[in-house]
Amino acid sequence: MEEGKNWIVPTWRVPGRRMERWHSLVKYLKYRTRDLEEVRYVPHHKVGWAWWTCSRVIFPLKGESHLEIQAYWNLTPEKGWLSSHSVRITWYTERFWTDVTPDYADILIHSTYFSCFTAGEVRRAIRGEKLLSCCNYPQAHKVQVPSLQYLALVVVQQNDRPQRKGTARKQWRRDHWRGLRVARQDYRSLKQRGSEPSAPRAHFPGVAKVLEILA
């Protein structure tokens, strides 16, 4: 009798409802804002023989390397091993490949995608001038020892944002959602006329936060 073979890989459990949000965010950043234009998104129906794979998202990185986030589904939750969804995060280089944590995946993604503070921002902050750039991926810095320059720029960036309380906050929310509705209407009308508007640069909340990864 032939023995059964077990396939063991490190995975991170993900609530099922988060998987759809992950796919939507990747497609939005790839096709709408173009922040992830070079990223390859492979849905389940294009994966091929790996029926347990829900999707593959491949991030080309600097040099001859890339990061792959592979989502799995139908992983025997009835036996108590895993929830029905999980992801595997793998870093491939020329010489080796290894599984990495979501925190390190954020660092790798931030090294190639999403803007950060430029070198001249410290001088602008000292002179009291307005910052011309910002960090669109702050989650990637949380596992690193931040420099004093970075901490100072974060404080300046936060102080530049207006503080809203009480009725002012409610009014801002109403204006915000009204602006989103107007933007969607303008986008549809421009699309009907055959022109494509440019979307603003997006903030990426981080792999673990988007997927609500469970340890």
UniProtKB/Swiss-Prot annotation:
UniProt KW keywords: AIDS, Host cell membrane, Host cytoplasm, Host membrane, Host-virus interaction, Membrane, Phosphoprotein, Ubl conjugation, Ubl conjugation pathway, Virion
Q: What Pfam families would the database entry show?
A: Vif (PF00559)
Task: Give the GO cellular component terms, alphabetically.
Answer: host cell cytoplasm; host cell plasma membrane; membrane; virion component
Which residues carry the post-translational modification Phosphoserine, per the record? 147
Compartments, as annotated in UniProt: Host cytoplasm; Host cell membrane; Virion
Q: What does this protein do?
A: Counteracts the innate antiviral activity of APOBEC3G. Forms a complex with host APOBEC3G thus preventing the entry of this lethally hypermutating enzyme into progeny virions. Functions as an adapter molecule, recruiting APOBEC3G to the ubiquitin-proteasome machinery. Targets APOBEC3G for degradation through the assembly with elongin BC complex, CUL5 and RBX1. Binds viral RNA and affects the stability of viral nucleoprotein core. May play a role in viral morphology.
Per the record, the domain comment is: The BC-like-box motif mediates the interaction with elongin BC complex. The HCCH motif (H-x(5)-C-x(18)-C-x(5)-H) mediates the interaction with CUL5.
Q: What is this protein called?
A: Virion infectivity factor
Q: Which organism is it from?
A: Human immunodeficiency virus type 2 subtype A (isolate Ghana-1)
Gene field: vif
